[in-house]
Design a protein with these regions (language model features):
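Immediate post-signal-peptide N-terminus of mature secreted/exported proteins
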Residues: 41-96, 228-279
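Bacterial N-terminal signal peptides that target proteins for export
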Residues: 1-12
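Preference for long, well-ordered alpha-helical segments
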Residues: 178, 182-229
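Ser/Thr-rich, Pro/Gly/Ala-heavy low-complexity intrinsically disordered linkers and tails
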Residues: 28-43
Length: 325
């Protein structure tokens, strides 16, 4: 999927939904919290706007949500591509997917470096290292090399500890043990997605979406520590900030799930009944339902019309794809 198209789509969609969801007449905020769900890029040093959703703290949380969500999707797609190409890391499709993943790692390190300059390079080195361990796990699973799988798991356990110490050395408000513990679901959920990819399971996209969903919590924890450390204005966990983060995650996921479902349909020759296509479409629709429930949590009467409209526009993209194919 073209990265520029994905970013533009997220930005436009996020702006439209946020305009409807965060600026109701007669009230600057809503006391009803949205449903947490699956996963807009902005500067971590974003200037405060006029509302609580535009505070520096809210912007930080949304930025980390987007970047960390993309990390999971890009990692999952790169690893699945490697599996589909028989583990050939020199295949052009694999090389392209890995480059896109590394570009996200660089962007994430630069976001960290924008507030902690000395941490940018160590963060990038550490982040790239843990991706390599996931590659080892994937290749071990694909080749049925139990020793390789075991070592990859051990390496990732050690990485969690080292990464926690790195973050704590920069942000004392975030205990090393807590950061390491927070990474457990990230590692396990990505293991689950990789296992599904290696097995050719139709629920691969659902597993990957679950892994991406965890990044909402990870971003919240990291943003909370950084905001406190830097004295950023706004409330990281306020209703407006949470709404922005959830919508960022869900709209991000929408584009990834739609792109992956359409790509799967093309790879399967347009057979919409193929199990892999059905699984990808089901994962995409689950995201649509989650997004409609977020809208419905603040505007109950809009939930069903929103879902119907959202599903309709996805159908148009399916028609376009089948027409092109």
């Amino acid at each position: 999927m073209d990265a520029r198209f994905r970013t533009i789509t997220i930005s436009v969609a996020a702006a439209a939904v946020l305009a409807a969801g965060c600026t109701s007449s007669g009230s600057s905020s809503d006391s009803t919290s949205p449903n947490t769900g699956t996963s807009g890029h902005s500067s971590m040093s974003q200037d405060p706007g006029t509302g609580p959703d535009a505070s520096a703290a809210a912007g930080l949380r949304a930025t980390l949500t987007a970047l960390l969500s993309d990390h999971v999707w890009l990692a999952g797609n790169a690893l699945q591509t490697a599996v589909l190409k028989g583990g050939d890391l020199k295949d052009p499709a694999v090389v392209g997917a890995v480059k896109a993943l590394d570009a996200n790692s660089v962007a994430l390190s630069k976001a960290v470096g924008s507030v902690y300059p000395d941490a940018e390079k160590p963060f990038l080195a550490s982040w790239r290292q843990h991706i390599g361990f996931f590659v080892d796990y994937t290749l071990g699973k694909a080749t049925k090399n139990a020793a390789m799988v075991t070592k990859a798991k051990s390496d990732l356990d050690g990485y969690r500890t080292a990464f926690g110490q790195l973050i704590n050395s920069v942000v004392p408000e975030l205990p090393a043990d807590a950061v390491a513990k927070e990474l457990i679901p990230h590692v396990q959920s990505l293991f689950d997605a990789i296992d599904a990819a290696v097995a050719g399971s139709p629920d691969f996209q659902t597993k990957l979406a679950a892994a991406a969903e965890h990044m909402v919590m990870t971003a919240d924890i990291l943003a909370g520590g950084i905001a406190k450390n830097k004295g950023l204005d706004g409330d990281v966990d306020g209703t407006a900030s949470t709404t922005r983060s959830v919508l960022t995650a869900q709209l991000n996921d929408h584009v990834w799930l739609a792109g992956n479902a359409l790509d799967t349909a093309v790879l399967k020759g347009g057979d919409l009944k193929d199990p892999a296509v059905v699984g990808a479409v089901n994962a995409l629709d689950a995201n649509s339902v989650a997004l409609s429930k977020t809208v419905g949590s603040v505007y109950p009467d809009a939930e069903k019309p929103f879902l119907a409209s959202w599903r309709q526009h996805i159908g148009f993209f399916v028609d376009y794809t089948l027409g092109k194919a």
